[in-house]
Amino acid sequence: MIYKGHHYILDASEAYGLCGHWLLKNMNEVATKAGTTVVFKTSVQLPVTGGSSPPGFTSVCLLDESHLTAHYYEDKGLLAMDVWKHR
């Protein structure tokens, strides 16, 4: 297997009261401090009109050859984060 980078997954429970824009701001700050280039970032409040997702948000920082994502399920207090950093 060829080494390509680091992949981290975080699942947290009892994470109540989170704000997507606050988390996105912190994700952007962490990515910048880690020396990566943020090429796009957004946070979407869920459910979107016509969608069937439970209440919460999805926040995304697309990085140069990497990504940092967060999915938050407000009613269940669940936060799932995924971080991939290329080399």
Task: Briefly describe each language-model feature range.
Residues 1-87:
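Polybasic/polar functional segments that serve as interface/processing modules
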